[in-house]
Amino acid sequence: NTYKSLILSYSADYRRILRKNTTRRNTSDIKPMRPYILLISLALSSCAASQCPQLYMNRTRGSAPCYFTDEYGHAVFGNARYEDARQFIGDRAAVRLNGKWGFIDPSGATAVPLQYDWCGSFGEYGFDKSVAMVKNEVDKFKVPILSDCPTALIDRKGNRVTPFYGFIFPVRDKVAFVNDGRTDFADTRLQNLGFADGKWGCVDPKGRLVVPCVYELAYLLIATPGFTIVRRDGKWGVLNDRGRPIVPCVYDAVYYKEGHTVIDTQADTSEAGKSVAAPNGGFREKLLYMQKEGETEIFTEKGRRVRGQ
């Protein structure tokens, strides 16, 4: 838009000069258009140079090897072949060679060394376009994004913007939960809740730590948009979509229901599988029933106390 305005401005100026001098019938005063053409050419060249070329990843007969082409289907990068690859996101494309993932730039040069067992694209999984997720020691029997293994976020130059966590969950709402553990999940029944030796915290979409890793359990694989039920020092509470406490971690158990989604922390964590006791009139949907010392307090999904239930 800036260059278009510039061109239109110079064209309008030239037309005004032309009309003025033609009216006076003094053609010798008409200024040549060459400077204007030069400025327009420079503007267009600068505009074109600022854009990345249109490059596309293709597969040979629908599988490996992968290669890249221009918009006309011509192979680029000297017919380079990769075991696997993804489309360019901005000026970076993830590629795999000799079993390791990294990133290349639009010239085909290595932008991030091929040294990871798996990586996502920049801006993927809800993260900012300036960061990408990388993993090592991925469990081949698990979907990579859900594999608990050394996981970090890197910038476009390959610098780590987070330490290696045991797990980084995709961004939900406004933060992504991370776990600083290394040992596998504490309990196969609770593999969506926590690690044996780590705790949960939160990073923002750019990878900045916004909530310290202090929660031993968190319900993450269950759809509860806007809040997350967590446990700290054996007590349950609720965080909002930014990872901030809206119900303090002082309760013995939590019950929540919406449609087919049911969270019953007492049934999930007790060996006997005993459920949270229902209040008079039963449980209502989209309310948080927090139990402490045999008494039940009720909260909305925003953390507001409900009375008279």
Q: What do the PLM-derived regions correspond to, one by one?
A:
Residues 35-45:
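Sec-dependent N-terminal signal peptides
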Residues 11-13, 23, 43-47:
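Intrinsic disorder/low-complexity segments in short proteins, especially the signal peptide
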